[in-house]
Amino acid sequence: VVNEVSKTPIPGVYELRIDGNEIFYTDAQANYLIEGNIIDVRGKRNLTEERITKLTTVKFDDLPFKDAFTIVRGNGKRKLAVFEDPNCGYCKRFERDLQKVDNVTIYMFLYPILGADSVEKSKAVWCAKDQAKAWQDYMVRDVPVTPAMCDTNALTRNGEFGRKYKITGTPTLFFADDTRVPGAADATQIEKLLATATKG
């Protein structure tokens, strides 16, 4: 489904936005479909990447917090949202580093993208009596999760949200100033990003 057609800086070439955030290009008669990036060589800018970033920007306050659980440390004044998969090795390393960060509220979005086992583990964590404890026990202390049953539609919604906003890897971090960081950050980087986000 074509959502939008708009001009590009190249005469006769138009941008097609398809299925929400997919970008393609075409000629004025729509005889040709071009897949790839438009690079502004003089300006040293990837215009396609900039456009996708703009389309997939997520305002922190617009995150679907009802589909996350919270972990509060210290006064919880600073805020961080994280999309993670329980089978992601980088997420486990990130979680260990995150233990060193205090005075923060962490909104944890379970985002099982690494297979069926990730889905089962995410369901077990989501359905646990104490989600935060079950998550940290598994991710930091390697304590197996106990299977449990409950409404797990939040996991489906997290998957839909992630696809819509191109969350393609875990962990993906969101800060209160709308900064998005793909990949694991260490405690020092997290502290810097939280400090910057809190200034705003």
Residue ranges and their predicted role:
Residues 1-123, 137-140, 144-170, 187-200:
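Extracytoplasmic thiol/disulfide redox context detector
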Residues 19, 176-177:
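Short strand-turn-strand beta-turns centered on an Asx-Gly dipeptide
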Residues 115, 178-179:
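Short secondary-structure capping/turn micro-motifs that flank functional sites
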Residues 129-132, 136:
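Conserved, helical-rich catalytic subdomain that frames metal- and/or nucleotide-binding sites
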Residues 182-183:
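Short, exposed beta-strand-loop hairpins at the edges of beta-sheets
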